[in-house]
Amino acid sequence: MSTTHDNLILAGDIGGTKVNLGVFRAGKTKPLTVIRPETFPSRSAPDLETHIEQFLDRHHIAQAIKSACFGLAGPVIKGRAKATNLPWIVSETNLQKRFGWPKVKLINDLVATALAIPLLNSTALLALNRARADRQGHLAVVAPGTGLGKALVAVGTNQMVPVASEGGHVGFAPANQAQVRLWRFLHQLFGHVSQERVLSGTGLVNIYAWLRDAEAMEPAAAVEKALETAEYNAAPTITEKALAHQDTICQRALTVFVEIFGAIAGDWALSTMARGGVFLGGGIPPKILPVLRTGDFMTAFCAKGRFSKVVANMPVRVILNDRAALLGAARYALMS
């Protein structure tokens, strides 16, 4: 690969299940272009540095990288982060020492996703309602995947400022009697029942376990087999069986999941007054589009009592581009 006249950026989207790495070419008059994207299972290496080293060696581009930025699922404090769902501690200082890049930045993965939103075209977004965006309104991002992430993009005069949060770890508020029973079931297991316990890949498995163990629904053989291997393997199986209408407990689990998703997204939209739009990111939303479009999501999203009309006028979009966070990380490296 020729790199003579390129300003090459290494970007990463570091999640609990997978690591996305990509090299971007940045020109003064051209948009960011990814030229070497690759995905790895997160736990296939002992740390992020090993993933990066293998990636650079495979593509023979270590010397061409001028800057790097990594969006990581977890709080980033003073250039250092402990991954929420991985046994990794990552720091800008250690990365710079190991690889010798002039510039290295760590940011929250939802900040990376938020930074990508202005760069996404219409084919990368799916509308769940007909509300129109206020160009001066804030943007909200809610992203269930291995965990649950949230971010705000504060919009001011001629600027957009992404703000990280750990809102996925606030308490889960049940919206009906069935969800109260779910909360009680999880409270016995975990004590504090965060939103991530019900709105994530693991959250879907938790809902399934509640239906099986506390609501006396017949277990699904395929899910039970997946659970024997590893808990994180069960969520895709539940989703697959539910979307194919092959198992009642899986269908019910996904319905409850979507209702909770709508309520939590609506809460975040109202908390941030996201008149510029609510964007659903993460790995799960694109995989469950048929159930997101049934109306259950938007009904729960808008069920905000006296403020129902306020949230109903906020546009809701699903991010379909699975490299959005990677693109946002590259954009941050270019900006900084």
Name each region found by the language model.
Residues I77, K103-D134, E228-V258, A263:
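ATP-dependent carbohydrate kinase catalytic cores
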Residues I9-D13, I65-C69, K105, A131, ...:
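Short glycine-aspartate micro-motif
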Residues T50, T93, D109-A112, T146, ...:
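Residues on a specific face of well-ordered alpha-helices
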Residues H59-L106, V111-A124, V141, P286-P290:
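Short beta-strand-loop/turn "lid" adjacent to the catalytic site in phosphate-handling enzymes
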Residues M1-H60, A64, R181-S336:
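ATP-binding/phosphotransfer module of carbohydrate and carboxylate kinases, centering on a glycine-rich
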Residues A124-E196, L289-P290, D296-C302, R306-V311:
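Glycine-rich phosphate-binding loop of actin/hexokinase-like ATP-binding domains
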Residues F40-S42, A83-P87, K105-A112, A131-D134, ...:
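Active-site nucleophile and cofactor-binding loops and adjacent substrate-binding regions
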Residues I117, A151-V155, W210:
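A short secondary-structure junction signal
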